[in-house]
């Protein structure tokens, strides 16, 4: 049993969340107000705008209403909505022309920090600056929330493994799901299904040496390498095994995976020579959007396209399997709810200890508000 399990008999105590909490708009509203508005508020990574003058529009936040801007020694979150006629200014990502943010509609211009510079044909300067937010930074990850991120993660034992120094952003993907965001986190936080449901991942990692690390606002799973990557469990993972071993000259990696969850919705994943950040954004009680960022060491990002392709294909294979689990759980919970039944099973320790920790976190933070 893990340290968490030793504090309780997991099969006898039940911090499980009521089934209605996965479907109730009132609970969804409470989560937004008391969890997300008081959470770390992950914005993006510094590598999204790596050089001074670079910007990236965060399409998944407020319909592209904010842009991440590199202002030399720091990154800022600057409003991307013109103060004149409320038009979106910047698109996609790139470098600010002349170092200024200029709306294409009427040529209103702003500094890279949002200060209003010019309004053509106006006799008096309106002085309408773009709102700007300063950001916290941890391992290159940028936050605008109310948590003290450095304090929350000060004792994180795997911080050095999640160091993005020398890594480049490869791509950002968004995926929409038709289930509650908590269901996704639950599946991410339990290893009990890895063997039975993930033929590829289950032969890449082994949960036999699963180690947990837990803090008030996070948990970490570290799992080992399965059979020195000698027996791939799927054709897709076979390519990923081959690329990892080729790049490492036949030497297995030190870990199979490290999975950090920074509550409520930020996940950082370590795989051999890969770092992935994914962030869940609720869109109501039965919808959520996952924003996935892939980062690789510069050498791999620039010169190893086969490595990148194999890793992402393996990642997506596992993601599709996880989605099926989430859909099945959602269908089952809805069936019970419609039938007026409240049923919950036991937690398996240590493989579902993270789910216990998450359920206790949710109850602690919003229980009094729902």
Predicted features along the sequence, with ranges:
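Short, contiguous pre-domain boundary segments
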Residues: 1, 5-19, 165-167
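Generic structural "secondary-structure junction" signal
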Residues: 19, 23-24, 37-38, 45, ...
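Non-catalytic accessory segments flanking enzyme active sites
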Residues: 21-61, 67
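Conserved acidic
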Residues: 23, 74, 314
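Generic structural signal for secondary-structure transition and capping sites
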Residues: 36-40, 87, 193
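Short Pro/Gly-enriched beta-strand edge/turn motifs at strand-loop
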Residues: 38-43, 50-51, 115-121, 259-264
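Rieske [2Fe-2S] iron-sulfur-binding domain
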Residues: 48-147, 154
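C-terminal catalytic domain of Rieske-type non-heme iron oxygenases
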Residues: 69, 79-80, 134-136, 141-143, ...
């Amino acid at each position: 049993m893990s340290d968490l399990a030793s504090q309780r008999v997991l099969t006898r105590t039940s911090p499980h969340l009521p089934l209605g909490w996965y479907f109730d708009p009132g609970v969804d509203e409470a989560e937004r107000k008391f969890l997300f508005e008081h959470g770390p508020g992950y914005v993006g990574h510094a590598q999204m705008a790596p050089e001074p003058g670079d910007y990236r529009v965060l399409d998944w936040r407020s319909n592209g209403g904010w842009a991440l801007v590199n202002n030399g020694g720091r990154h800022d979150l600057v409003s991307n909505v013109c103060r004149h006629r409320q038009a979106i200014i910047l698109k996609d990502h790139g470098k600010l022309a002349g170092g200024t943010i200029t709306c294409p509609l009427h040529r209103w211009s702003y500094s890279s920090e949002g200060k209003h510079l010019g309004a053509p044909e106006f006799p008096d300067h309106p002085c309408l600056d773009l709102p700007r937010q300063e950001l916290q930074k941890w391992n290159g990850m940028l936050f605008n929330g109310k948590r003290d991120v450095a304090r929350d993660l000060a004792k994180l034992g795997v911080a050095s493994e999640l160091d993005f120094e020398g890594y480049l952003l490869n791509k950002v993907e968004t995926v929409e799901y038709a289930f509650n965001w908590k269901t996704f986190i639950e599946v991410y936080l339990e290893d009990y299904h890895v063997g039975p449901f993930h033929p590829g991942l289950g032969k890449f990692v082994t949960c036999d040496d699963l180690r947990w690390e837990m803090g008030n606002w996070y948990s970490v799973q570290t799992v080992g390498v399965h059979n020195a990557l000698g027996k791939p469990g799927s054709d897709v993972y076979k390519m990923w095994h081959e690329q990892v071993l080729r790049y490492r000259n036949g030497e297995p990696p030190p870990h199979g995976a490290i999975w950090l969850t920074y509550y409520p919705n930020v996940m950082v994943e370590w795989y051999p020579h890969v770092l992935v950040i994914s962030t869940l954004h609720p869109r109501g009680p039965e919808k959520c959007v996952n924003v996935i960022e892939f980062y690789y060491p510069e050498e791999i990002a620039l010169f190893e396209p086969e490595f990148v392709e194999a890793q992402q294909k393996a990642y997506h294979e596992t993601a599709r399997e996880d989605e099926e689990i989430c859909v099945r759980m959602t269908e089952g919970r809805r069936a019970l709810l419609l039938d007026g039944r409240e049923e919950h099973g036991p937690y398996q320790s240590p493989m579902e200890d993270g789910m216990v920790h998450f359920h206790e976190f949710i109850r602690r933070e919003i229980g009094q508000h729902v």
